[in-house]
Amino acid sequence: MNAPGQNIREVPAWLAVAFDEVGTKEIPGDGHNPRIVEYHQATSLKATSDEVPWCSSFANWVMKQVGIKGTGSAAARSWMTWCRPLTRPVYGCIVVMKRGKNPGAGHVGFYVASLGDNHIRVLGGNQSDAVTIATFR
């Protein structure tokens, strides 16, 4: 049951899959979480370690679960050409963030909320070494 005044919105299929993965995290030390290694298999990199950056691997894996072809790349910024740019984010849309001047550095996840002051909430992989919902500016 929804609380009074709570918005009811349809959750895109890919976002429902992503929500189900919240809490998946890296194994400290020499071990590797098999689920994160599985995410990597959705990319051409096919990494076998949870120490390899995996935000794009997670996004590709999520899309694959619902029959949508992602970028196939482990590079976060590969998603910049996968979809069309939006002037305002839509619940569940892909968010790509640049990091520094390195053209390969970035982060990708799924938009879940705006908080004001240019802050957004993103559900993504490899956020503090886990699948989480985190705040970004």
Please give the residue ranges for each predicted region.
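N-terminal capping segments
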Residues: 1-66
